[in-house]
Amino acid sequence: MWEANPEMFHKAEELFSKTTNNEVDDMDTSDTQWGWFYLAECGKWHMFQPDTNSQCSVSSEDIEKSFKTNPCGSISFTTSKFSYKIDFAEMKQMNLTTGKQRLIKRAPFSISAFSYICENEAIPMPPHWENVNTQVPYQLIPLHNQTHEYNEVANLFGKTMDRNRIKRIQRIQNLDLWEFFCRKKAQLKKKRGVPQINEQMLFHGTSSEFVEAICIHNFDWRINGIHGAVFGKGTYFARDAAYSSRFCKDDIKHGNTFQIHGVSLQQRHLFRTYKSMFLARVLIGDYINGDSKYMRPPSKDGSYVNLYDSCVDDTWNPKIFVVFDANQIYPEYLIDFH
């Protein structure tokens, strides 16, 4: 199921409150066949209907039966990703995982009212995301150091670095970048005709001045640097945190910031600074040894369409990966360490 854009939600709610309720009351006769609809991300009303994609557990008919039993009550249902509750009194649906709401309506059923898959609907967000705010470009959610999620990230870092150096780990929640990544993954699976694409969690070290830009726009080697581009002109990732740490800089922005607050450049050592490293989800797919001249992965068969997905330092034991398409990357975690 999909989340509605907040601005669209409020506009539709205002229009809906002026028209639909009166129309429903006037037309509520015993021989009317009613359907139940939700306001989709595309701005159109889609009918509730079980389907193989979302695995929705409730149908329009189920909702109507519940409504007739108790017009001021509610009904709960699930999809493959989330649990929901429909409130008949409010005529709204709430995602019990994220807390997000969207409008629903009861309207006369017609053949044209059947639901359909809209091409520009949003892809469901990961179920472990929390307090999602769709009105900001991204969110940094601090992970508690006792959680499984924190320890999973810290253990990957700790394979080649001392995990006690970690100051904090934050989850990056960027719906736009997540959708781009998911659509790219689906595209590659369709192109290859395979059920899964080779995907790895890889590290990327960078200067602190680029952190916010990466969280908003994703990685861009033209801006973030390419560290020599030995294996191609793309974004570089490493299997080992120790390697990526070589490119992390605790360059505070910058000397002027301290001077404005009355701190001299000589006193900067009194302030503890931290370095930043990303742990990204990367679709490495099919890879080949890289070359400094590559602007994109080379062809598998000499054609212009059948290309590798990424380049590496050594196909037998890859430690460095180069990705040329940002949509193959989702910057998932930001690790601050000293």
UniProtKB/Swiss-Prot annotation:
Result after altering residue 236 to S: Catalytically inactive mutant
CDD domains hit by this protein: TCCD_inducible_PARP_like
Pfam families: PARP, WWE
Substrates-to-products reaction catalysed: L-aspartyl-[protein] + NAD(+) = 4-O-(ADP-D-ribosyl)-L-aspartyl-[protein] + nicotinamide; L-cysteinyl-[protein] + NAD(+) = S-(ADP-D-ribosyl)-L-cysteinyl-[protein] + nicotinamide + H(+); L-glutamyl-[protein] + NAD(+) = 5-O-(ADP-D-ribosyl)-L-glutamyl-[protein] + nicotinamide; L-lysyl-[protein] + NAD(+) = N(6)-(ADP-D-ribosyl)-L-lysyl-[protein] + nicotinamide + H(+)
Effect of residue 102 to A: Loss of subcellular location at the nuclear envelope
Domain WWE: start-end pairs: 22-106
Chain positions with ADP-ribosyl glutamic acid modification: 13
Record note on modification: Auto-mono-ADP-ribosylated.
Sites of ADP-ribosylcysteine modification: 56, 72
Subcellular location: Nucleus, Nuclear pore complex
Keywords: ADP-ribosylation, Differentiation, Glycosyltransferase, mRNA transport, NAD, Nuclear pore complex, Nucleotidyltransferase, Nucleus, Protein transport, Spermatogenesis, Transferase, Translocation, Transport
Effect of residue 204 to S: Catalytically inactive mutant
Modified positions (N6-(ADP-ribosyl)lysine) in chain numbering: 18
Modified sites of kind ADP-ribosyl aspartic acid: 87
Source domain of life: Eukaryota
Induction: By type I interferon or viral infection including zika virus infection.
GO-annotated cellular components: cytosol; nuclear body; nuclear envelope; nuclear pore; nucleoplasm; nucleus
GO molecular function: NAD+ poly-ADP-ribosyltransferase activity; NAD+-protein mono-ADP-ribosyltransferase activity; NAD+-protein-aspartate ADP-ribosyltransferase activity; NAD+-protein-cysteine ADP-ribosyltransferase activity; NAD+-protein-glutamate ADP-ribosyltransferase activity; NAD+-protein-lysine ADP-ribosyltransferase activity; nucleotidyltransferase activity
Residue span(s) of domain PARP catalytic: 123-338
Coiled-coil parts of chain: none
Single biological process term from Gene Ontology: protein auto-ADP-ribosylation
Family the UniProt entry places it in: Belongs to the ARTD/PARP family.
Functional description taken from the UniProt entry: Mono-ADP-ribosyltransferase that mediates mono-ADP-ribosylation of target proteins. Plays a role in nuclear envelope stability and nuclear remodeling during spermiogenesis. Inhibits the type I interferon activated signaling pathway. Mechanistically, mono-ADP-ribosylates beta-TrCP/BTRC to promote IFNAR1 ubiquitination and protect BTRC from ubiquitin-proteasome degradation. Additionally, acts as an antiviral factor by cooperating with PARP12 to suppress Zika virus replication, independent of IFNAR1 regulation or intrinsic PARP enzymatic activity.
Protein name per Swiss-Prot or TrEMBL: Protein mono-ADP-ribosyltransferase PARP11
Organism: Homo sapiens
